[in-house]
């Protein structure tokens, strides 16, 4: 996704509260020229429009600083007022010059599980995104998760996922991604079958009195 974004360098001594009263949002760029950070600002309307189009810690976008640096960045953090929800601050991270970056990628489930199609099972998606390390020059939009072979009772773990080349998962390998459970009707039938099996089990015959 290409989202041109131009920010101004923040004036020395500018007070964030005063800026917000004037319709400007303070921001900061990290990873710019090593560990140096750069104080920035942008119009509130521009910031709010940006937040409608990008995902925190996921979308890489081009950023240009007026009369200064330009390059690709991640939107790392968004701060809102805890009471009123007012936008307070944005943090960006420059990805250029880094061998890999850490970000969150959404999971896209593909196929129809056999256990759903044949047995009426219910698929529960436990995980909706993965935290990964990836080269900044080749970031996939999402991680595809093929669920077509899942049967009722199956559980899919992070370690089972097929990842694009160069992607390294940060999440715990044994974290559950999805599992397939019987439908309520299926569970009821299983309970009935179990009860019938218990009744049909041959029990010990009572002893008869001699006489």
Curated annotation (Swiss-Prot):
TM spans (from-to) = none
What biological processes does GO assign it? translation
A GO cellular component term found in this entry reads: cytosolic large ribosomal subunit
According to the record, the residues making up region (Disordered) are: 186-211
Pfam family name, one: Ribosomal_TL5_C
The protein's UniProt keywords, in alphabetical order, are: Ribonucleoprotein, Ribosomal protein, RNA-binding, rRNA-binding
Q: Can the keyword Cytoplasm be found in this entry's annotation?
A: no
**SS bonds (residue pairs):** none
The record's GO molecular-function terms, alphabetically, read: 5S rRNA binding; structural constituent of ribosome
Q: Which InterPro entries does the entry mention?
A: Rbsml_bL25/Gln-tRNA_synth_N (IPR020056), Ribosomal_bL25/Gln-tRNA_synth (IPR011035), Ribosomal_bL25_b-dom (IPR020057), Ribosomal_bL25_C (IPR037121), Ribosomal_bL25_long (IPR001021), Ribosomal_L25_dom (IPR029751), Ribosomal_uL5_bac-type (IPR020930)
Give start-end of the signal peptide: none
Q: Subunit arrangement? A: Part of the 50S ribosomal subunit; part of the 5S rRNA/L5/L18/L25 subcomplex. Contacts the 5S rRNA. Binds to the 5S rRNA independently of L5 and L18.
Family statement: Belongs to the bacterial ribosomal protein bL25 family. CTC subfamily.
User: Tell me, what does this protein do in biology?
Assistant: This is one of the proteins that binds to the 5S RNA in the ribosome where it forms part of the central protuberance.
Task: Indicate what this protein is called per its UniProt record.
Answer: Large ribosomal subunit protein bL25
Q: Which organism is it from?
A: Gloeobacter violaceus (strain ATCC 29082 / PCC 7421)
